[in-house]
Regions:
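Residue(s) in the substrate-gating loop at a strand-loop-helix junction
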Residues: 55
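A short, exposed helix-loop element centered on a Lys and neighboring polar residues
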Residues: 35-36, 80
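C-terminal helical subdomain
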Residues: 95, 113-160
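Substrate-binding pocket helix/loop in short-chain dehydrogenase/reductase
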Residues: 11-12, 19-21
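A short helix-coil junction within the Rossmann-fold of NAD(P)-dependent oxidoreductases
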Residues: 37-46
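The catalytic Tyr-X3-Lys active-site helix of short-chain dehydrogenase/reductase
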Residues: 25, 58-61, 66-74
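Active-site-adjacent segment of SDR/Rossmann-fold oxidoreductases
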Residues: 42, 60, 76, 81-91, ...
Length: 160
């Protein structure tokens, strides 16, 4: 499981470019580096579980988090490709979008809600994604005692 993070929140118009790049480097390139390091080992042993840490900010957006949201959606793109490249070697790659109070997010949630967002509520989803029965290419949102699948969909489209 790769999980490293920093925040440099500001609206896009006010965000220094350096803050944008720094956050993308930590979240997206850090995740890619972790996966790149273990993937060859997993390929040789024909088994592996990679869990990418994404975020609801990447999946749905959040004001003032263009850098963070872009990086976390980039992690989903990385997962979508690794699930294909690893499938024939029994390497399953999934993403988790946790919602929990941490030192980094402590100020974002009201005090009366923080108990519900204890990181312990993320653990069952992580254990499942690390197990032999893990799916391949799933995005799970986890927090407050709820685990939900999240999907990127394409409709039938309209012909013109």
């Amino acid at each position: 499981m790769n999980n490293a993070g920093i925040l440099r929140d500001k609206s896009f118009a006010k965000m220094p470019w350096e803050d944008f790049v720094t956050v993308v480097n930590v979240h997206l390139l850090g995740s890619a580096l972790c996966a790149h390091t273990v993937f060859p080992i997993m390929k040789v042993q024909e088994y592996g579980r990679i869990i990418m840490t994404s975020s609801s900010s990447g999946l749905f957006g959040n004001f003032g988090q263009t850098n963070y949201g872009a990086a976390k959606m980039g992690v989903v793109g990385l997962m979508n490709t690794l699930k294909l490249e690893g499938a024939k070697y029994n390497i399953h790659t999934n993403a988790i979008a946790p919602t929990a109070t941490t030192r980094m997010t402590e100020s974002l949630f009201p005090d009366d809600f923080k108990d519900k967002l204890d990181p312990k509520y993320i653990i069952p989803a992580v254990i499942f994604l690390a197990s032999e029965k893990a799916p391949n290419g799933e995005i799970l949102q986890a927090g407050a005692g709820v685990i939900a699948n999240t999907y990127i969909m394409e409709t039938m489209g309209k012909y013109f």
